[in-house]
């Protein structure tokens, strides 16, 4: 048996040459996908972004994270979306936040790229019915739903497992050390993607890729 869950490593670097260097390191460590955090670049312009994507030549999630959800992009919303639209033909996935205008999400989805519609809350975990509402809305707008919440107790992390067990094509994460196990459990529910750390931790509770691969392989061996 094998897991169909891909391991993605976010690349959060300010300089073009560092993005490429870290990407090569993460590929060598066994990443299945790289999340290119475009918003981390010092001066993101499409010529540099295109060069990076072509140089890496590996499955990529293009993310240009909005500041209200932990991102660093400093331009206008129109500039942020324009970069994602230009990236769409060059990458495997585009991540766009649910709070973005629906017309922008539709424009990206209409390019044909696999569209991840995401929602992050770094302060709390809502009630299960609210999470379900968010996921269902994301699924209507895109191809893959993504939610990530900060747990305040163990019960909050169990809500994430419930979402994973009931919702297809969904990435669901409970952040912090308390919720880190949900990143491993994602493979149990055939979540399309889980996130691990390469050189740097870019979100609370990320597990380094070596440990993640070891845990996933251990789990799969027990199931054989």
Curated annotation (Swiss-Prot):
A GO term for molecular function: 3-dehydroquinate dehydratase activity
Active-site residues from the entry: 120, 146
Gene3D superfamilies: Aldolase class I
Pathway: Metabolic intermediate biosynthesis; chorismate biosynthesis; chorismate from D-erythrose 4-phosphate and phosphoenolpyruvate: step 3/7
Alphabetical list of InterPro entries matching this protein: Aldolase_TIM, DHquinase_I, Type-I_3-dehydroquinase
Reaction(s) this enzyme catalyzes, per UniProt: 3-dehydroquinate = 3-dehydroshikimate + H2O
The keyword Acyltransferase is annotated on this UniProt entry: no
GO biological process per UniProt: 3,4-dihydroxybenzoate biosynthetic process; amino acid biosynthetic process; aromatic amino acid family biosynthetic process; chorismate biosynthetic process
Top EC category: lyase
Family: Belongs to the type-I 3-dehydroquinase family.
Protein's UniProt name: 3-dehydroquinate dehydratase
Gene name linked to the record: aroD
């Amino acid at each position: 048996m094998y897991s169909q869950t891909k391991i993605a490593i976010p690349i959060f670097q300010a300089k073009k040459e560092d993005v490429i260097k870290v990407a090569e390191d993460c590929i060598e460590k066994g990443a299945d996908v790289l999340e290119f955090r475009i918003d981390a670049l010092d001066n993101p312009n499409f010529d540099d972004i295109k060069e990076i994507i072509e140089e890496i030549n590996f499955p990529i999630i293009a993310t240009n994270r909005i500041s209200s959800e932990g991102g660093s992009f400093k331009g206008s919303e129109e500039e942020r979306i324009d970069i994602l639209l230009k990236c769409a033909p060059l990458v495997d996935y585009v991540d766009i936040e649910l709070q973005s205008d629906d017309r922008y999400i539709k424009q990206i989805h209409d390019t044909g790229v696999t569209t991840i519609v995401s929602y992050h809350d770094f302060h709390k975990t809502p009630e299960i019915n609210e999470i379900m509402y968010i996921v269902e809305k994301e699924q209507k707008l895109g191809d893959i739903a993504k939610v990530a919440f900060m747990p305040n107790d163990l019960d909050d992390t169990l809500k994430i497992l419930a979402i994973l067990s009931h919702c297809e094509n969904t990435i669901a994460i409970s952040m912090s050390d308390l919720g880190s196990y949900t990143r491993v459990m994602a493979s149990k529910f055939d979540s399309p993607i889980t996130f691990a750390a390469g050189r740097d931790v870019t979100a609370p509770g990320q597990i380094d890729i070596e440990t993640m691969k070891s845990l996933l392989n251990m789990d799969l061996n027990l199931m054989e």
